[in-house]
């Protein structure tokens, strides 16, 4: 059934205008974004397919344009629109976390890092620079590519820590493959950076391996 053939109070756009966005289901909100469907599948059904395929709204939040190609009927324009909206949502959530949260627990860091790195298609090494009260000063991406002990320069991390007057740091990198287990190279790099930063009295609190669905704390594994 076409959405235009639904009763007026069941059409997503009319429902939103009459009752507000909170009255709509996740699939209905996505239908408004999609606007049109395919023969035999309306926008509401396509919205539900997106939710089913990617694990709900939380899963969609970590989905990139390439993964959206698996949904029949999503052309380049629609994929770009969805990715843009998801990126705005990630940025809004990241700003809220940055303003409200002290990064004093692994879970607080996990939430922030998954928003920032979880959906990236390429491997990225990043550092959270924290003040003496574990408030975030900055998150900086310092390297892109396969992570090795020689690909990340300790000197660069030390220079940035001093420039930002950081008291401690949290290291992080993503595994686009989805494998969250730290490698031996991850362990060696962590110890190299820990030694370098200790020379300027900056503590390495943790090193996280981030995927779309998981962020693993190396400190909790006794590897920091």
UniProtKB/Swiss-Prot annotation:
Question: Which cysteines bridge via disulfide bonds?
Answer: none
Where would I look for the motif JAMM motif in this sequence? 173-186
- What's the protein here called? UPF0758 protein Pnap_3339
Query: Per UniProt, which keywords does this protein have?
Result: Hydrolase, Metal-binding, Metalloprotease, Protease, Zinc
UniProt-listed InterPro entries:
MPN (IPR037518), RadC_JAB (IPR025657), RuvA_2-like (IPR010994), UPF0758 (IPR001405), UPF0758_CS (IPR020891), UPF0758_N (IPR046778)
Task: List residues of the MPN domain.
Answer: 102-224
Q: Which residues bind Zn(2+)?
A: 173, 175, 186
Q: Sorted alphabetically, which Pfam families does this protein's record hold? A: RadC (PF04002), UPF0758_N (PF20582)
């Amino acid at each position: 059934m076409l959405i235009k053939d639904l009763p007026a109070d069941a059409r997503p756009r009319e429902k939103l205008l009459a009752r507000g966005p909170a009255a709509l289901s996740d699939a209905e909100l996505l239908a408004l974004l999609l606007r049109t469907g395919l023969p035999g599948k309306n926008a509401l059904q396509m919205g539900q397919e997106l939710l089913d395929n990617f694990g709900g709204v939380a899963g969609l939040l970590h989905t990139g344009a390439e993964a959206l190609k698996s949904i029949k009927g999503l052309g380049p324009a629609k994929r770009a629109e969805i990715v843009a909206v998801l990126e705005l949502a990630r940025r809004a959530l990241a700003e809220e976390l940055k303003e409200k949260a002290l990064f004093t627990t692994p879970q607080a860091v996990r939430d922030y890092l998954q928003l920032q790195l979880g959906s990236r298609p390429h491997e990225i090494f990043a550092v959270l620079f924290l003040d003496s009260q574990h408030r975030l000063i900055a998150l900086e991406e310092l390297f892109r590519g396969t992570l090795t002990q020689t690909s990340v320069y300790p000197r660069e991390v030390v220079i940035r820590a001093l420039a930002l007057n950081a008291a401690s740091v949290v290291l992080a990198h993503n595994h686009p493959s989805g494998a969250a287990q730290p490698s031996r190279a991850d362990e060696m790099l962590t110890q190299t950076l820990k030694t370098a930063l200790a020379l300027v009295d900056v503590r390495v609190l943790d090193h996280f391996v981030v995927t779309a669905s998981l962020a693993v704390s190396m400190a909790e594994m006794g590897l920091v």
